[in-house]
Amino acid sequence: MNLSVAIVDIIGIPYDGTTLEKRGLGGSESAVILMSKELTKLGFSVTVFNNCVDDAKPGIYDGVSYRNVKDIPDNEQFDVVISSRTVFPFVPKQLQNMINFDASAFSFMRTHAKLKIVWMHDTFCAGDHILENLVVNGFIDELFTLS
C-alpha cells in the first residue's frame, strides 16, 4: 500500500509540473515540484494543491497530480499533508479568528491526515504568530526547515 501525500501551496505563484521547463520559478515552488517527483519515484501517491491558473494547468505531470487549491476536496483523505510556507491549512475552526484566512475548506483534510507537516522555505511563515500553539496542541506534527 502506498501512502498518499498532499502538498498544499496556497501562497505560491502559479506553476505546474512543466513550469521549470518553460520559465524561471521561485525556489520554494521549484522545491515542491522536484520533491513531489522524487516522492512519486519512491512510491508515494502525490497531489499538489496550488495556484493552477494562467499558464499553469491542473493535470498529472511525472506521476504527480496538480490540482487547483480552490478545488480542495471535502471528502478526500491523505495520509500526509504538507503545507508549504503557511500554517493556515492546519488552523482549526476555534482558532481561525487569529488569522486572516478561511481555512474551513481544509477541515476534512486536516482532521483525517495521519501526519501534518509545515515545510518552511523562507524567513517567514504565514501564521507564524500561532505556529507554536498549533505544534504544542497537536494540530501540526512536524516542521521542516531549510538552512
Task: Locate predicted features.
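N-terminal subdomain of nucleotide-sugar transferases
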Residues: M1-N51
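Soluble or luminal CAZymes and related metallo-dependent hydrolases
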Residues: G27-A31, I82, L146
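Extended catalytic core of nucleotide-activated donor transferases of GT-like folds
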Residues: F49-I140, T145
